């Protein structure tokens, strides 16, 4: 039976690399579990064996016996920050952990699946740019730089983009879609796809529905990041997405 499950599960034993910001890395600040344990002290939200929060990539990896490398950083962007571009002497180039600076070149050789979800910090801290940009100094350009490199370096890896479903502006969401289409990268649109459940936000939701969902899936009133239930739910449809790309 175990061999049958392994043979029929395309994700089983594969290496998943997750790239993004705090919505992928996990942010449970100002939160405690029912026993008063905070964040990394609580087994409810933190895996001490793997040294990472139990965000949606963790759920996928644990469920399918995958190797997980979570490269997401709280506050992270894909492009170099406009603060650094405006004042390079006083703002470090790596202050926002820009994925398109060096990280995308350092994924190693053992790569099966790559998930990329950026935009929430970029819309405040990076320049949008245009679809024709070929620079890591704009949001559009950073995706172009990263995708060109990844499909060249890893021709047989499965690469997928995610349009985040929380607070992302229309312009930055559209940039994620357009660059994915440009480079032939499949994407999961959490903002517009009506065929999946929502956790925090979705295009067209009424204010009442959004208020109910936010109360259910925010860490708490003082932390608007996804809670552990939101990550578990999100993992189910990202899992399905990975199986289709």
Regions found by a protein language model. Name each.
Residues 1-3, 118-119:
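Charged, low-complexity intrinsically disordered tails and linkers
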Residues 3-50:
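Short glycine-rich His-centered loop
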Residues 13, 20, 26, 72-75, ...:
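Glycine-centered flexibility sites
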Residues 15, 35-132:
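Conserved SGNH/GDSL esterase-like catalytic core that processes O-acyl groups on lipids
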Residues 26, 77-80, 169, 195-197:
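Generic structural signal for helix capping and beta-alpha/helix-loop junctions
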Residues 94-245:
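Alpha-helical cap/lid subdomain in secreted, periplasmic
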């Amino acid at each position: 039976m175990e061999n049958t499950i392994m043979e029929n599960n395309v994700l089983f034993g594969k290496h998943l690399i997750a790239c993004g910001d705090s919505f992928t890395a996990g942010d449970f600040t100002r939160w405690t579990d029912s026993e008063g344990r905070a964040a990394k002290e609580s087994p409810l939200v933190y895996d001490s064996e793997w040294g990472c929060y139990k965000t949606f990539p963790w759920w996928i990896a644990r469920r399918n016996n995958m190797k997980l490398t979570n490269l997401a950083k709280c506050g992270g962007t894909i492009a170099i920050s406009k603060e650094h571009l405006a004042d390079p002497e006083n703002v470090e180039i790596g202050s926002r952990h820009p994925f398109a600076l060096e990280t995308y070149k350092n994924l190693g050789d053992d790569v099966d699946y790559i998930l990329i979800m950026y935009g929430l910090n970029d819309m405040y801290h990076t320049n949008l740019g245009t679809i024709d940009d070929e620079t890591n100094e704009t949001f559009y350009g950073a995706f172009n730089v990263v995708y060109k490199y990844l499909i060249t370096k890893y021709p047989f890896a499965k690469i997928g983009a995610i349009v985040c479903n929380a607070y992302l502006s229309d312009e930055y969401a559209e940039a994620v879609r357009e660059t994915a289409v440009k480079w032939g990268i499949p994407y999961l649109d959490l903002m517009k796809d009506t065929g999946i459940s929502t956790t925090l936000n979705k295009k067209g939701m009424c204010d009442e529905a959004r208020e109910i969902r936010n109360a259910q899936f925010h860490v708490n009133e003082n932390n608007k990041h996804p809670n552990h239930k939101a990550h578990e739910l999100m993992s189910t449809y990202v899992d399905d997405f990975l199986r289709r790309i």
